[in-house]
A protein has these predicted regions:
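Gram-negative/organellar outer-membrane beta-barrel architecture
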Residues: 46-56, 61-202, 286, 357-361, ...
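Membrane-embedded beta-strands of outer-membrane beta-barrel proteins
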Residues: 56, 72-74, 108, 156-158, ...
Length: 387
């Protein structure tokens, strides 16, 4: 028995065939998209076009002093001259986050290498309306002394280096900072201390630098050495509490290939601030996501900071790697003696660009455990290597 008229039956069959064709086409498109994404993000083949790479990550977190944090972090890696086979990777990074307590943090950075690596330009523009935890000065501070301090920072930093010899660069730099600081707790150690700069201030730093760099790759180094000296002076331009002195920064790195896929990476730093007037916000801070991972940045702070770290890197696949690291460091001054504390942990690496060796870094690190306190630790997600 024919339930549908013949014309309607033909129309139904035609519609069904069209639906099957569209569904099949949709499946093919979906498969093509999956294949393209798989090739782009998982393939072990390097892009022969030497094109740039772009990555965006969500920035989500929670802390008692900020509430819920949300935003984006992005990185663009490229060559300023793709025709130069020896040119180094240039990078532009942009990050912006907000919080449920109306705080904000914006940072734009560039690291540019020109043709033949003749010139190297670094810049940073930052606005930060963000609280930080203050524990005191020196290495003998305690979690119980933690105090929230509100801070607004505006920063502009420019640096230019010129090649003067084989792997050797000389440079000049300028940096302007404007700090606005406030603490509502009059009975806490921050307001009761004799610190300089408790309400903020501004500073202009003029400096010179010397760099030796023969690393094989600036994004993920597997062999070579890096040594940089930076000296910057802040003249007395504004109020009597603004910084008037000198910043000295030394950074040494070595990368030793132990195997085709295994690298031992080493780093040592020394940072010092000295002069007639040194505001507390210019003191050197231990911790963060680059050196002495596992410690809150500023958990220990003083006029001098000395630290070193070693990282064993195993890149078992062109797209993936694992690392283990350890470090030791301390702040110190004439008033406060040094007390070296450990840092150790491990992490995963995903390389989103094989051409530029650009990576996403997942690290978890531990620090010391002071008497009566929990062991200090931290998780880090970043769009670059620690060093």
């Amino acid at each position: 028995m024919q339930i549908l008229p013949q014309s309607l039956s033909k129309l139904t069959r035609y519609t069904a065939l069209c639906a099957l064709f569209i569904a099949g086409t949709g499946d093919l498109k979906a498969q093509n998209i999956i294949q393209k994404l798989s090739k782009k993000f998982l393939s072990a083949e390097k892009d022969s076009t030497r094109s740039g790479s772009f990555m965006v990550l969500p920035a989500v977190g929670y802390a008692q002093e900020t509430g819920v944090e949300y935003g984006l972090a992005s990185s663009y890696n490229f060559y300023l001259d793709r025709s130069d086979p020896y040119i180094r990777t240039s990078t532009m990074t942009l990050m912006g986050t907000f919080t449920s307590k109306h705080q904000s943090n914006f940072k734009f950075q560039t690291d540019l290498w020109t043709k033949n690596n003749d010139y190297h330009f670094v810049s940073e523009i930052r606005y930060r309306n963000w609280p930080f935890n203050y524990y005191g000065i020196g290495m003998d501070t305690w979690k119980a002394d933690e105090e929230r301090v509100d801070q607004k920072l505006f920063r502009v930093k420019l640096e230019a280096e010129k090649k003067i010899g084989h792997n050797l660069y000389s440079g000049i730099n300028i940096q302007y900072d404007n700090f606005s600081i406030r603490s509502d707790s009059s009975d806490h150690i921050f307001n009761q201390s004799n610190l300089i700069g408790k309400e903020g201030g501004q500073q202009l730093l003029l400096g010179v630098s010397q760099l030796f760099d023969n690393r094989d790759n600036v994004s993920y180094s597997t062999r070579g050495y890096y040594a940089k000296l930076r000296l910057a002076y802040a003249p007395k331009l504004w109020t009597r509490e603004d910084f008037n002195g000198t910043n000295l920064d030394l950074d040494f790195r070595g990368f030793i290939p132990l195997h085709q896929k295994v690298t031992l990476a080493l780093q040592g730093i020394f940072r010092s601030t000295f002069g007639k007037t040194i505001p507390f916000y210019n003191y050197r801070e231990l911790g963060g996501d680059m050196m002495m991972r596992g410690y809150y940045l500023g958990r220990y702070r003083d006029k001098n900071y000395l630290a070193s770290q070693a990282e064993l890197r195993y890149r078992f696949h062109p797209r993936f790697g694992i690392v283990g690291f350890s470090g030791i460091g301390s702040t110190f001054s004439k008033e406060n003696s040094s007390r070296y504390v450990p840092s150790y942990g491990g992490g995963l690496r995903y390389f989103f660009s094989l051409e530029h060796n650009s990576s996403i870094r997942f690290d978890y690190s531990y620090g010391e455990q002071r008497a009566g306190e929990k062991r200090q630790s931290g998780f880090y997600l970043s769009l670059s290597e620690a060093f």
